[in-house]
Amino acid sequence: NLAKRILNTEPDTKVIGLDNMNDYYDVRIKEARLAELQKFANYTFIQGNLADKELINSIFEQYHPDIVVNLGAQAGVRYSITNPDAYIESNLIGFYNILEACRHYPVEHLVYASSSSVYGSNKKVPYSTDDKVDNPVSLYAATKESNELMAHAYSKLYNIPSTGLRFFTVYG
């Protein structure tokens, strides 16, 4: 858990957690992890939605983060087939809200979750960050590729250093 690691190794760092606590993943697991984090005096949890622009702006206005790590998104390739609205709201509108907040309340760096899904139907293995990613095979992948393009544009237009992490699904 990234937040726990930061709280344990950087005791003077304030960590703000935002989660809508939806039930795509088991809420009891989220609540158990949240209970561990709330033991730290320098941890603040806010239950809310990335797509709530007013909330995002108020968080940035109140806390003025130096570094933003956005791991929030609606996950799951298959779920995107039957629930496209959830992906547009969280992965596009929510990410746009984060980018806009980073623009209006300048940050040192934005780190965000992308996905290996951006490689789409690429048959070449191993994958490389130099591979073309212009052939998504799901709405989820398209939203993650869009995030990368949006972050790149904001980085160039508004000088927001950003790093996208293309996570792979873990089996086991």
Residue ranges, per PLM feature:
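N-terminal Rossmann-like NAD(P)+-binding domain of SDR-like oxidoreductases, especially those catalyzing
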Residues: N1-V170
